[in-house]
Amino acid sequence: MGRSESQMDITDINAPKPKKKQRWTPLEISLSVLVLLLTIIAVTMIALYATYDDGICKSSDCIKSAARLIQNMDASAEPCTDFFKYACGGWLKRNVIPETSSRYSNFDILRDELEVILKDVLQEPKTEDIVAVQKAKTLYRSCINESAIDSRGGQPLLTLLPDIYGWPVASQNWEQTYGTSWTAEKSIAQLNSKYGKKVLINFFVGTDDKNSTQHIIHFDQPRLGLPSRDYYECTGIYKEACTAYVDFMISVARLIRQEQRLPIDENQLSLEMNKVMELEKEIANATTKPEDRNDPMLLYNKMTLAKLQNNFSLEINGKPFSWSNFTNEIMSTVNINIQNEEEVVVYAPEYLTKLKPILTKYSPRDLQNLMSWRFIMDLVSSLSRNYKESRNAFRKALYGTTSETATWRRCANYVNGNMENAVGRLYVEAAFAGESKHVVEDLIAQIREVFIQTLDDLTWMDAETKKKAEEKALAIKERIGYPDDIISNENKLNNEYLELNYKEEEYFENIIQNLKFSQSKQLKKLREKVDKDEWISGAAVVNAFYSSGRNQIVFPAGILQPPFFSARQSNSLNYGGIGMVIGHEITHGFDDNGRNFNKDGDLVDWWTQQSANNFKDQSQCMVYQYGNFTWDLAGGQHLNGINTLGENIADNGGIGQAYRAYQNYVKKNGEEKLLPGLDLNHKQLFFLNFAQVWCGTYRPEYAVNSIKTDVHSPGNFRIIGTLQNSAEFADAFHCRKNSYMNPERKCRVW
């Protein structure tokens, strides 16, 4: 072998020799065959590997989804012991609540990201902007113009005060200036009709619950200066908030007196503001608790204005209160005359009865101090820095935040809240994928079908009521993404804001203009038909909605993004995300409130007595379940199972419907490829993505606030409560019976 190779090599490098035909040796033939075989094997292996499907999705979208899920979860936690920790443990380790936020969650992160988009589109000058968009950008610039706002101090507010009968504590000789012309009817009405501020009496024009095509006047109990009536106990966990509230009043009164160069008597300021607190405590105690206001049938009390006067007589400053004069003071601002035969709806008869003895105890000065304060406290954040800073301790007591929200964020939200269609146009053009609309339409159709099919499973509901429920489900109208008109009909959009004209240097006046505009628009509706095609939300919103009076579900563009939805992410994630949200909103039509409205949106009892009784029995299971959860962040308080019932019913119904819809999808289309890096099947991924939507935490101060004011359960209990009731979840994660996440007793309504 060596000799032959040497000859070949030598031949190659030495002088040529006479040619003669050479034969391959057996060894050379063997080697050649071996090389050929190895080449064939290598090519075959490469071809097989290139086409080999290991069942793992390797697209960039799958990799992103997997990375997000892995980052958020704590795989070392036991899913059957605490699924919140399992799903969100990683998120909790990585995220800290910002100093400006009272809570932080995946929802809030999406909202933060949306606000960045709004900032970018609102601050970008474009010569081709339509008039409505130009106005939105002017309003935004006026809001972020801190130098102009600071240079004006409290002067814009001082200019406004005479229009609302002043603020006695911050005035000199109030009785002589306003006392002779002051009447309770005029003072309460002025705040309402011009600025939409409802103090002492909540008067508003809204849809008639029993005739949802018409508007009607409503009388209700007012909102309070503190988050809920419980705060006015002013002891224990509420003590700091009460102290900060009174100090806030005193600080603002002091600033206004200083600005007017009036003498300051600290004792007098303290005396008057503590009197306001006493009055507001009595009003708070007169209001009905939220858990006693959950039945819309009991809330609805229709009567004539004359009967209202007869049933609920009030006396202020020794004079009888005229409900007719009060009503006409408000409605005359939009040129509508109200006769005593006008029908109105009273939502709070108990409150109006209890209000009478309270009002007789207080002077016009006391009442005006309260009314003006409640308006002023809303406007403080629109004034110069020293006014804003007077709110710091109060904000900390209620929300736990040590810093104000960044100006640009606050302003982007303010403009979006007041010009939602103009801002929605900008957001949709910048960030919304139009093809999402059709995919979500299909998801809604699937989940609606599942809801109707599952009616057959309900043993507690009779056939007659099931038939009506099916009719209502089929009649639900959906709104997805945004109203087409905000893009296609520029004239309509411009006309919507025709009356508004903003100035960059006058942010405060712009705010007042918005208050007047929105209140006037609402009052004018009294003699107009309800526009049931009107959207109940703007497009640039990370949320979803159900309207009982319209029987309408709405999914704004802002929520149609991961983790809720993407046309390019696994369908298990879409069904666990936006699918669950769709089911949640559909179920709202049949929760403890929505079930009282028929397919046309009218407050009508369409239930048989037996089915209604059974519904209450089924619901009671969830009242107990959620009411037994204690929240450490809120000082160990129990959740309110009654106030959160509607949302809990919707969560439980939504997850069940979405899961069954996903099972139908798999039967039709086959199993999806698994996600890389996760040892989880798609049933498990469905529940994991659902849970991660609610990853988040609260500051203790806001937990105390939220447990009394939010109709939603905190995120961790939305996960735990819903999945404890899901046999499908227990099956997917192989949870043994009677483990924490798989209790023997499960609650189900829908």
Curated annotation (Swiss-Prot):
The active site is at residues 585, 651. Residues 2-28 are cytoplasmic. One of its GO terms (molecular function) is protein homodimerization activity. Keywords: Cell membrane, Disulfide bond, Glycoprotein, Hydrolase, Lipoprotein, Membrane, Metal-binding, Metalloprotease, Myristate, Phosphoprotein, Protease, Signal-anchor, Transmembrane, Transmembrane helix, Zinc. A motif (Stop-transfer sequence) lies at residues 16-23. Residues 56-750 form the Peptidase M13 domain. Disulfide bonds join 57-62, 80-735, 88-695, 143-411, 234-242, 621-747. It is found in: Cell membrane. Its EC number is 3.4.24.11. The chain crosses the membrane at residues 29-51. CDD domains: M13 (cd08662). It is a single-pass type II membrane protein. Glycans are attached at residues 145, 211, 285, 311, 325, 628. Binds 1 zinc ion per subunit. It is an enzyme of class 3 (hydrolase). InterPro entries: MetalloPept_cat_dom_sf (IPR024079), Peptidase_M13 (IPR000718), Peptidase_M13_C (IPR018497), Peptidase_M13_dom_2 (IPR042089), Peptidase_M13_N (IPR008753). One of its GO terms (biological process) is lung development. Zn(2+) binds at residues 584, 588, 647. Its main location: membrane. Residues 52-750 are extracellular. Pfam families: Peptidase_M13, Peptidase_M13_N. The modification Phosphoserine is found at residues 4, 6. Its cofactor is Zn(2+). A lipid is attached at residue 2 (N-myristoyl glycine). Belongs to the peptidase M13 family. This is Neprilysin. It comes from Rattus norvegicus.
